[in-house]
């Protein structure tokens, strides 16, 4: 689970001309036999716009999601299947205007996709022949999340002064007495109300890194002795999240307020870091974990495949065809058409909003930090 700043969904995005645009796979390095991002670049391809399922499928390829074959999607499909099979098949998973599905419908869809995976490389038209494409009205607002890496020490020392706290044992009882709220970020950081209680999991080099770790909800600590450890979300203090980007825009400090712009401002203005961060009262606590980012299904999320959704709008276990033009350092923007799986949620993800898990590489950091774009989406339902 993770926190993200809500995005505005417009009435729609204009139909984009079918001009030649470089198409990339968003491949990441360091993933076993997977190829690198550069090896996946295709010379030409249309930008993503509001388009028909037929046009979408024509330009759909597994390499877009760092896969050499659709077969490699099988482990992700199995994760969703385990989840939906735990639900009563006849129970309603979603019932809203334009979409009513039972858990059995979701299971049937996943089983059909699993059955087709060996054939899809040669027969992509099977996506159209075997599934109904239920379009999400007015499209989706897309953003991204990733697995951050935070420099840390197991002990406090010069250069490592920012505490990363475990869940306080008194928080549940305190919340009962104070309308569901614990200490604010300002109280925790300025008044040091948790210091000296043995809750420090580690000490980070940069408070800004820890702040963005809270937004993502999980990541890796890279210790000064060369070791690493997974760190996962354990709980939140009950106060409403307010994004630092919004705070800085309201103060006239930034125009856009994306994460890269924020980081540069914090680097240039270290004396004001606490002032800005403490205006967000929300605070996240952590625990050490044995694996990477874990979604709402209880399984590790998969890069370019796992989607965080509002489960009241798109239920967990849903197969989603999604399209968005993603930011790219070299080319500015590259089209991504993919098949995704609703496997995670986030506190600020509401209705027509999807958060794409981008992985743990530098490229994942760049895409997730800059992605803020509209695009089409369809819920796939087995015919």
Indicate residue ranges for each PLM-predicted region.
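Solvent-exposed, well-ordered loop and adjacent helix/strand elements within mature globular domains
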Residues: 31-383
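N-terminal start and proteolytic maturation junction detector
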Residues: 5-7, 25-27, 40
């Amino acid at each position: 689970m993770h926190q993200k700043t809500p995005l505005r969904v417009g009435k729609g995005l204009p139909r984009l001309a079918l001009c030649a645009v470089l198409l990339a796979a968003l491949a990441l390095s360091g993933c076993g036999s997977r190829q690198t991002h550069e090896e996946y670049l295709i010379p030409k391809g249309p930008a993503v716009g509001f388009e028909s399922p037929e046009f979408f499928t024509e330009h759909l390829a597994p390499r877009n999601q760092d896969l050499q074959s659709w077969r490699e999607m099988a482990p992700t499909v199995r994760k969703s299947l385990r989840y939906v099979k735990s639900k009563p098949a006849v129970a309603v998973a979603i019932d809203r205007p334009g979409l009513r599905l039972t858990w059995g419908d979701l299971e049937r869809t996943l089983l059909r996709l699993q059955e087709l995976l060996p054939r899809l490389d040669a027969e992509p038209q099977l996506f159209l022949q075997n599934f109904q494409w239920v379009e999400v009205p007015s499209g989706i607002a897309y953003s991204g999340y990733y697995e951050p890496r935070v420099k840390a020490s197991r002990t406090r020392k010069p250069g490592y002064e920012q505490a990363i706290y475990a869940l306080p044992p008194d928080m549940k009882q305190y919340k009962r007495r104070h309308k569901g709220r614990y200490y604010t970020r300002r109280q925790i950081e300025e008044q040091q109300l948790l210091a000296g209680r043995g809750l420090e999991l580690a000490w980070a080099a940069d408070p800004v890194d820890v702040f963005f770790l809270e937004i993502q909800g999980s990541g890796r600590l890279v210790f000064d002795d060369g070791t690493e450890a997974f760190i996962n979300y354990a709980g939140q203090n009950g106060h409403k999240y307010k994004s630092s980007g919004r705070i800085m825009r309201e103060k006239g400090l930034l125009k856009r307020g994306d994460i890269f712009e924020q980081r540069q401002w914090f680097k240039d203005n270290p004396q004001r870091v606490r002032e800005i961060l403490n205006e967000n009262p929300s605070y996240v606590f952590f625990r050490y974990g044995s694996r990477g980012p874990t979604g709402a299904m209880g399984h590790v999320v998969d890069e370019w495949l796992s989607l965080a959704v509002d489960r009241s709008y798109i239920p967990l276990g849903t197969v989603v065809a999604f399209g968005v033009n993603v930011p790219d350092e070299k080319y500015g923007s590259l089209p991504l058409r993919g098949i995704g799986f609703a496997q995670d949620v986030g506190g600020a993800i509401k209705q027509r909003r999807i958060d794409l898990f981008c992985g743990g590489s530098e490229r994942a950091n760049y895409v997730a930090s800059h992605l803020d774009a509209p695009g089409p989406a369809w819920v796939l339902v087995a015919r």
